[in-house]
Swiss-Prot record:
Coiled-coil stretches noted in the UniProt entry, renumbered to this chain: none
Listed EC numbers: 4.3.2.1
Presence of the UniProt keyword Lyase in the record: yes
GO CC, alphabetical: cytosol
Span of the signal peptide: none
Protein name: Argininosuccinate lyase
Family: Belongs to the lyase 1 family. Argininosuccinate lyase subfamily.
Alphabetized GO MF terms: argininosuccinate lyase activity
Pathway: Amino-acid biosynthesis; L-arginine biosynthesis; L-arginine from L-ornithine and carbamoyl phosphate: step 3/3
Lineage: Bacteria, Bacillati, Bacillota, Clostridia, Eubacteriales
Keyword Amino-acid biosynthesis: yes
């Protein structure tokens, strides 16, 4: 059933029907469409726009349809133009002419925006729970590896010794920001648009506040033109999803490197790895590689909607129908990526010895050697130059700094004493960095405590129960 057609003399070309239809995409919003219609029908009755008896017939019919659709008794007719027309035609089939009253004081323009906001609010709640679970996985791994020394990198060159806990907590901070962006997107989505009509509200005495309360919105939108043409909340969500994928992709790239024989820092569980059809020895990090690849897909969803919206005049235009396919694809991709990634991290084995051995190579304690000289009275720039000469000689002689005798060190500066060896021990290098945010046990324990409180705080948020 089409919700329009009275002014047309000819039927729509079948190709146009297929091109125009969105039922394959928006059918996943059937619950939200019915929820919105239930609130709308109740309001129509309360405001005496239709009789309370007729309102009750409509709501009873909608509840029965919802029940039957949930139980697969009613299957969605994919020849319908969209989910809105399908629900209304099904309602009319079940309760007769009364079903034709449902669309009073409503347009598909405000209806589809309502449905999408209802759907997205639920999706954001689920998404935040998925991120919080990943945070819990990182928290537990961080607790286990407070003392697991590894090299920290800049420019993919070994730089300074850190701990695995410190490294994991860096990603925990990224995902904390992601949760903040999800919360912000939720706030912008939590504005009820129904009652805006096609673009200029309605001549009926509707009560938008009643509908907002029934549907759990914190506020109503304040301009009808903006209400039906706004997709900022979708773009904001897609932006947040893109950043989540960027963070997952960065982490995945490191996991891929760490799995190689050249690094051998971690070993992925068999259940999160795949093999080769020709090379029997292979154990491939396909999960991490796919997440890295799917990041571009989510970026594409964001660019799609930004491009769709960039030249649209007020108010609603059919271009906006493209919003849902991009949003749903991104939500599905990020949700599956988060869950799979969390499982991969939770089950992977850490090769502690290899991490420490790698940190011991590459002169990661060179900065600490320079700091030793500074603390003995040298200027930092002079100390930097001295240590640079020491490193150059060590490379030539294939030695580590700690392999040098005190006499050899004194050739570069008489300031060196026996205590230099303790100063450049990797554990000392890590533990001396007690500044908030650093890799020392004291600092990492503080970061872990903050992460625990963050998780506890948001798990207790009533919006997300």
């Amino acid at each position: 059933m089409k919700l329009w057609g009275g002014r047309f003399k000819k039927g729509t070309d079948e190709l146009v029907n297929d091109f125009n239809s969105s039922i394959n995409i928006d059918s996943r919003m059937y619950k939200e469409d019915i929820e919105g219609s239930l609130a709308h029908a109740s309001m129509l009755g309360e405001q005496n726009i239709i009789s309370k008896e007729d309102s009750l017939k409509i709501t009873s019919g909608l509840l029965e349809i919802l029940k039957r659709m949930d139980n697969d008794v009613i299957n969605i007719d994919l020849t319908s133009e969209d989910i809105h027309s399908f629900v209304e035609s099904t309602l009319t089939y079940y309760i007769g002419e009364y079903g034709k009253m449902l669309h009073t004081a409503r347009s598909r323009n405000d209806q589809v925006t309502l449905d999408l906001k209802l759907y997205l609010k639920k999706a954001l709640v689920k998404l935040r729970k998925d991120i919080l679970y990943l945070e819990e996985v990182l928290l537990e791994k961080s607790k286990e590896h407070i003392s697991t020394i590894m090299p920290g990198y800049t420019h993919m060159q070994k730089a300074q010794p850190i701990t695995l806990s410190h490294h994991l907590l860096a990603y925990a901070e990224m995902f904390k920001r992601d949760i903040g962006r999800i919360n912000d997107a939720y706030k912008r989505t939590d504005e009820m648009p129904l009652g805006s009509g096609a673009l200029a509200t309605s001549t009926y005495p509707i009560d938008r506040y009643m509908v907002a309360k029934d549907l759990g919105f914190s506020k109503i939108t304040l301009n009808s033109l903006d209400s039906v043409s706004d997709r900022d909340y979708v773009i904001e969500t897609l932006s947040a999803l893109s950043l989540i994928m960027m963070h997952l992709s960065r982490f995945s790239e490191e996991i891929i490197l760490w799995c190689t024989g050249e690094f051998n820092f971690v070993e992925l569980d068999d259940s999160y790895s795949t093999g080769s059809s020709i090379m029997p020895q292979k154990k491939n990090p396909d999960v991490a590689e796919l997440i890295r690849g799917k990041t571009g897909r989510v970026y594409g969803d964001l660019i799609t909607l930004l491009t769709v919206m960039k030249g649209i005049p007020l108010a609603y235009n059919k271009d906006m129908q493209e919003d849902k396919e991009a949003l749903f694809d991104a939500l599905d991709t990020v949700t599956l990526s988060l869950k799979t990634f969390a499982g991969m991290i939770k089950t992977m084995k850490i090769n502690k010895d290899n991490m420490k051995k790698s940190a011991a190579l590459g002169f990661t304690n060179a900065t600490d050697l320079a700091d030793y000289l500074v603390k003995k009275g040298s200027y930092f720039r002079d100390a930097h130059g001295i240590v640079g000469q020491i490193v150059l000689q060590c490379i030539k002689d294939n030695k580590m700094i700690e392999d040098l005798t005190l006499a050899e060190l004194k050739e570069y500066s008489p300031t060196f004493e026996e205590d230099v060896y303790d100063a450049i021990n990797l554990y000392t290098c890590v533990e001396e960095r007690k500044v908030i945010g650093g890799p020392s046990r004291e600092s990492v324990k503080f970061q872990i405590k903050e992460l625990q409180e963050f998780i506890h705080q948001f798990k207790g948020d009533e919006i997300y129960d």
